[in-house]
């Protein structure tokens, strides 16, 4: 018999809030976290805007020495995990039945860039012995596992911008199928560096707008690229009976997970949206419900011309003639695109949307593109009680992932 899986803890470091309360207040008040880049000199870059982490007190969570040999993306992951675990109030638990699955799209690119500079300026003997372990994508999961003494399972998912949704989905399966009782799942990213921004800009993937309110505009007729974000979100997934036995606070239930691969192009989605549509259908089937049961979709919605059109077709593929019945929004309009961490932040937002009976808006949306003719929640959130919600993530390489969450009612 398949076991049920619930969310019992939430932690987040994001451009619109450095804990779940601050983030949710920003969502309700329509705050956008996009501003001028301060992490590096943009004078030679066409891209001037990003969604950076602001006012994060790292030493509130760990002393300076503890974080000395952590890349920025690992610091974010450790802080989000600490928040989530404290929120879950897990104290006496079986470490051998506890796992960690954390995603990242790029990992320690800040460390890579810094050490490349040292190599070029001072020679190979001056490259830090900590360079490799600081840069590895899996080191966030490994470090968090050490922090928690979680010995049951530890893994990283690297599927570009679908990674964190895959991580949550894989954690869900590990618990549902009886391998683990607790999984710390999510993602972390810190790629607002000169090199990463230059690379994405060369692909013409980033918006070059200098107006922070018109840069990340998913589904808008004038959208022209995404805005880079950074941060981390972590969900504590727990087997239902395990959670009930200890009177845990339950935010929502994870009921379905689906994925697929376009097998089409290294960066472009299938033009008809069928790949992402199949991931949604797989999640719906896995949840044992029908498409009409879903009240809200937190879309991948990157604000690129290709993605938003393709995802619109994908939603139509999965929901058929009733596609207008489901509410859709992209919270990347507020957070920017956190790449491999985006699915975790958006799953956390979707969880709180279910709990608080409030649908987040797509901000700064002036004119909906006729090719994105969905039932989009525009500019102002909507108070609505829904039972099921879906969160989508799509990544370079043709990776498509969807999870379905169910409102928890005592």
For each feature predicted by the language model, list its residue ranges.
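Glycine-/small-residue-rich "gating" segment that lines the acyl/pantetheine channel
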Residues: 122-128, 169, 173, 189-245, ...
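A glycine- and small-aliphatic-rich helix-loop capping segment at beta-alpha/alpha-beta transitions
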Residues: 21-28, 110-124, 174-177, 197-210, ...
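Conserved small-residue
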Residues: 9, 27, 81, 100, ...
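Conserved beta-ketoacyl condensing-enzyme motif
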Residues: 7, 31-159, 188-197, 293-307
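Condensing-enzyme catalytic core mediating Claisen C-C bond formation in acyl metabolism
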Residues: 4-8, 31-35, 211-287, 295-296, ...
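Active-site-adjacent elements of ketosynthase-type condensing enzymes
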Residues: 44-52, 107-111, 190-216, 258-278, ...
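ACP-dependent fatty acid/polyketide chain-elongation machinery
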Residues: 1-66, 241-253, 348-362, 406-410
């Amino acid at each position: 018999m398949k076991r049920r899986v619930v969310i019992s803890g939430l932690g987040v470091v994001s451009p619109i809030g450095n804990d779940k309360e601050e983030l949710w207040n920003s969502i309700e008040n329509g705050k956008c976290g996009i501003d001028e880049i301060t992490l590096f000199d943009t004078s030679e870059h066409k891209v001037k805007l990003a969604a950076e982490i602001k006012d994060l007190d790292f030493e509130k969570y760990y002393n300076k020495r503890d974080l000395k040999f952590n890349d920025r993306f690992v610091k974010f992951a450790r802080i989000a995990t600490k928040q989530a675990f404290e929120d879950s109030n897990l104290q006496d638990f079986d470490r051998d039945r506890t796992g960690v699955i954390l995603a990242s799209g790029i990992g320690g690119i800040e460390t890579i860039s810094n050490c490349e500079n040292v190599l070029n300026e001072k020679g190979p003997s001056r490259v830090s012995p900590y360079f490799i372990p600081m840069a590895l994508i899996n080191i966030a999961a490994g470090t968090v596992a050490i922090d928690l003494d979680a010995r049951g399972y530890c893994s990283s998912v690297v599927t570009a911008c679908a990674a964190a949704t895959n991580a949550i989905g894989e954690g869900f399966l590990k618990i549902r199928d009886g391998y683990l009782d607790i999984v710390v799942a999510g993602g972390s990213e810190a790629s607002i560096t000169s090199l990463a921004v230059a690379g994405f800009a060369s692909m013409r993937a980033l918006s070059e707008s200098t107006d922070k309110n018109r840069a990340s505009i998913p589904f808008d007729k004038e959208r022209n690229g995404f805005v880079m974000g950074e941060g981390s979100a972590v969900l504590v997934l727990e087997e239902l009976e395990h959670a009930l036995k200890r009177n845990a606070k339950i935010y929502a239930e994870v009921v379905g997970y689906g994925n697929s691969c376009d097998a089409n192009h290294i960066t472009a989605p299938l033009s008809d949206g069928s790949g992402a549509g199949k991931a949604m259908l797989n999640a719906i089937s896995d949840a044992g419900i029908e498409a009409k049961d879903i009240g809200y979709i937190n879309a991948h919605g990157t604000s690129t011309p290709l993605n938003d059109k393709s995802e619109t077709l994908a939603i139509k593929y999965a929901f058929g003639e009733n596609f207008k019945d489901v509410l859709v929004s992209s919270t990347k309009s507020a957070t920017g695109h956190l790449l491999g961490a985006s699915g975790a932040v958006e799953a956390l937002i979707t969880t709180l949307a279910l709990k608080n009976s409030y649908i987040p808006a797509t901000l700064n949306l002036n004119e909906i593109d006729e090719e994105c003719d969905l039932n989009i929640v525009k500019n102002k959130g909507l108070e609505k009680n829904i039972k099921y919600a879906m969160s989508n993530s799509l990544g370079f390489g043709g990776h498509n992932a969807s999870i379905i969450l169910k409102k928890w009612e005592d």
